[in-house]
Amino acid sequence: MSDKYTGQCLCGSFRYSISTIDLEGAFSCHCIDCRRATGSAFAAVVPFKIDNFNGDVSVLKKLTHKGGSENDIHRYCCQDCYCPIYINVTRSGGMYLYTGTLDNISDITFSENRKFENGHFEYLNISNKKIEI
C-alpha cells in the first residue's frame, strides 16, 4: 500500500488525494455498464474506502442508473468535464476509483479481468490478468 496517491479529472478542476488503495485489487471490468460509462472496451478500477479519500466530493456530479442486476450504480464525475472519478455499486457496496484519474499508476497491479457473457469485444484475447489484441 502506498502512503498517498493523487489524481485529478481531465480538465484539472477536481483534484484529490487518497491515503490508501488496494494496489493488488485493481481489475478491468468488461460489463456493458462500464463500457458505456467510459466509452471504451472496459473500465480499469481499484477498490478504495471513501474515508481515505480527500477531495470535495460535493462538487462532483452524481449520475445514477440501474445496472444489469437492476440495482443502483452511482458514478461520480467532474461537473465541468464529466470525467468519471469513482463509482459506487450498491449491490456489493463496493467503491471503485477509476485508475485513469491517478497521477501515478506505476505501483498498480491488475488482479483480474471481469468479463460477462456477451460483455466483451471478441477481438480481445482476455485471460484472468492479461488483455491482448
What residues fall within each predicted segment?
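A short Gly-Trp-Pro
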Residues: 1-8, 13-133
